[in-house]
Amino acid sequence: MPVTHRKSDASDMNSDTSPSCRLRAFSRGGSLESRSSSSRSRSFTLDDESLKYLTHEEKDVLLFFEETIDSLDEDFEEPVLCDGGVCCLCSPSLEESTSSPSEPEDVIDLVQPAPGAGEAEGLPEGTQAAGPAPAGKEHRKQDAETPPPPDPPAPETLLAPPPLPSTPDPPRRELRAPSPPVEHPRLLRSVPTPLVMAQKISERMAGNEALSPTSPFREGRPGEWRTPAARGPRSGDPGPGPSHPAQPKAPRFPSNIIVTNGAAREPRRTLSRAAVSVQERRAQVLATIHGHAGAFPAAGDAGEGAPGGGSSPERVARGRGLPGPAESLRAGGQAPRGPALANGFPSAHEALKSAPSSFAPAGKSLCFRPGPALPSTRARQSFPGPRQPNGAQDWRRADSLPRPQGITVQFAGRGSSEEARREALRKLGLLRESS
């Protein structure tokens, strides 16, 4: 009999508590149904009015968005139903606590029978209406706490219920607190994926910019490796800067004729290749200035192919054309030291012997020898441009870089003006008349 009485009480309690929960669930469900109906009405209105003027692809896109919105609404409905079920679970416990003091005999009847069987029968009804399992477990724990008091002490049962209303209150707050995070996934789902990826990339870039000044070895290394390379040529600009205007190519000559200025090269390279010091070079220049009167016959005897006493480019061309480049090198190497120093030209042969150029066999090397002239003219006449004070640079071939194919002509001494150069090249057959 007490079991049946308990069943009736449980059914009465469920009947008493269910209407409020049902009203809440129905109110929320009605709002959700109104949302779905509004979306459907929107789709119907779109189908009726604006979809007439849209293409098939645009209609598909609109339908896709409507379906996604409906799916998001359905996903949002599930936690709402769970909240309603929890409220239904909490309300019966409250009503039990309120009804227990008014009916102490019913509480005594509930304690006497086997608690396992009675609770197992009463709880499924609550769980069917509730849904979530953790809330059902909490309800079982609350029921397990109430039965232990013995039969006779009714006042203890009266004192026991007051803590019960305080215990279900925290679950309500704990269940309502996570409700804002329930809307958070909805916001993440509604945000397009490209925007999320762009935000992540921007955050990473901002983090890298923040880390680059503090940790230059991570992000700033490529920049640091580039800056010294960029600053290197800047610091070295003053050195090679003046060398660019010192090597002008005459635009009026053909491309196969290259005219270089020997005095515009760096003195360190030339002196190191010639293996002579500045003092020795000055002594050679002085000897050349004082003793060039009888130097040309000695040079002719040595086999350099220049007729003595003449300084015209025509004679120089004929005398230079008799022996080949190799023969002139051999003759310069076999020439004695005395007349060579007096003439000043064997210094160029020494330079060629120490650093033979790779383009000597391919082309011709012409050196126009000056006649008797003043020292200032001998030392200064060449292409206009920055010159070294040392006049010995005029007697040497200063460039040992290989030229593809061409003729290197070095002018020095008297008659090195533009007309003399053109006349000499014309007689050699190296100048093409443009007119």
From Swiss-Prot:
Residues with the Omega-N-methylarginine modification: 252, 320, 378, 414
Modified residues (Phosphoserine): 8, 43, 166, 179, 212, 215, 312, 400
Modified residues (Dimethylated arginine): 320
Modified residues (Asymmetric dimethylarginine): 252
Compositionally biased intervals (Polar residues): 11-20
Keywords: Methylation, Phosphoprotein
Positions of region (Disordered): 1-22, 92-276, 295-420
Biased segments, Basic and acidic residues type: 1-10
Comp. bias (Low complexity): 92-102, 113-126, 228-237
Gly residues composition bias: residue spans: 302-311
Compositional bias of kind Pro residues: 146-169
Phosphoprotein among keywords: yes
Residues found modified as Phosphothreonine: 45, 146, 167
The keyword Phosphoprotein belongs to this UniProt entry's keyword annotation: yes
Pfam families the UniProt entry points to: SARG
Name listed for the protein in its UniProt record: Proline and serine-rich protein 2
Organism annotation: Homo sapiens
Taxon lineage: Eukaryota, Metazoa, Chordata, Craniata, Vertebrata
Record gene name: PROSER2
